[in-house]
Amino acid sequence: MMHVILPWELVEEILYRVPPLSLTRFKIVCKQWNTLFKSKSFVNNHLVRVRPQFLLWTDSKMYSVSVNLNDDQKIDMRELPLDIPYLNNFMRTYFTPCDGLLFCDSWSWRKKAAIWNPWLRQTKWIEYSKEKTFTFRGIGYDSGRPDKGHKIIGSSIYNKRKLIEDPLYRSVEIYTFETNGWKSMNTFSEEGEIRPLSDVSLNGNLYWVVSNGETHECFIESFDFSKEIYKCFCTLPWNYNSFHVPVLSTFRKDRLSVLKRKRMAETNNIEIWVTKNKINDDGEPVAWIKFMTVSIAISSNSSPSFFIDNVYQKSFIMCCEDENNKLCVYIVRGNALTKIQIVGVDAKNYINHCSYVPSLIPVP
């Protein structure tokens, strides 16, 4: 058989479309490939093309669940090696994806958080050492910088003179990977109850759903890591009293999407809304349009995670528990609905999941 040498540009185009797990194995194939996989241009071009999947974690294990959207629709589940020291129990552990990196925060860690890329098996611990009550919030980056400049945000509560009768003060703390240090900021978020597991990172900024306990309004807050300020992104056109907490995700890598479903509804309708325009700082009001409505019977206690794939005929993919509390992946394409139950998961007391885009971005 004649040995064919492909043009290097064609080799790159092919490798852009290879899943990260396979690429990490290819590092030992040739030195040129290994060098290529470490270049920023390749990492960024690969991230643009890679398809989202789901991360699934139980009380003791973590899995990746990729979804095949071809004609033969199926899922592929792999157990991921745990490269986070001291993490032997995932209960009350939260993972927030940020361009392929995972921000890991657990209630059992005292003022500690981890940044993790499971595909590169890289982990970095971040610790807050000041004598204040402290809560980690999430990770983002300065989108105006070529090297992104990743940062972590948290908030602290303290008493200036440490006297019981003195008032408590709140400070926003920002960790910069470039300096490996913390700084305090005089910036604050709007009042409201932050809904757990609602964080989404988009173009470096962090977004989450907040509800007002008195008016039952739901709105989206954000933190701009470039300007290091909080913003009220928008008020959602429905309230928390009538609907489950909205579930956030991204859309087309430059917009937000929301999953909306009614409480105690007579129907199983689930609505998916997306922002009409790209997210930017033009100051224009945020407009939402309905992307699709689907009828799926799921558990009333389920917290779905989802993503939208425009490559395969406007596909909506959701992971959640069905009406029998069995964890399933749902694929909606046009009028066709495919339900695939996730089996073989070791989940004694706890199970959770989120959508995630795997990448070759190294931990900063």
Curated annotation (Swiss-Prot):
<dbReference type="InterPro" id="IPR001810">
    <property type="entry name" value="F-box_dom"/>
</dbReference>
<feature type="repeat" description="Kelch 1">
    <location>
        <begin position="156"/>
        <end position="205"/>
    </location>
</feature>
<dbReference type="Pfam" id="PF07734">
    <property type="entry name" value="FBA_1"/>
</dbReference>
<protein>
    <recommendedName>
        <fullName>Putative F-box/kelch-repeat protein At1g12170</fullName>
    </recommendedName>
</protein>
<feature type="domain" description="F-box">
    <location>
        <begin position="1"/>
        <end position="50"/>
    </location>
</feature>
<dbReference type="InterPro" id="IPR006527">
    <property type="entry name" value="F-box-assoc_dom_typ1"/>
</dbReference>
<dbReference type="Pfam" id="PF00646">
    <property type="entry name" value="F-box"/>
</dbReference>
<keyword id="KW-0880">Kelch repeat</keyword>
<dbReference type="InterPro" id="IPR050796">
    <property type="entry name" value="SCF_F-box_component"/>
</dbReference>
<keyword id="KW-0677">Repeat</keyword>
<dbReference type="InterPro" id="IPR017451">
    <property type="entry name" value="F-box-assoc_interact_dom"/>
</dbReference>
<feature type="repeat" description="Kelch 2">
    <location>
        <begin position="328"/>
        <end position="364"/>
    </location>
</feature>
<dbReference type="InterPro" id="IPR036047">
    <property type="entry name" value="F-box-like_dom_sf"/>
</dbReference>
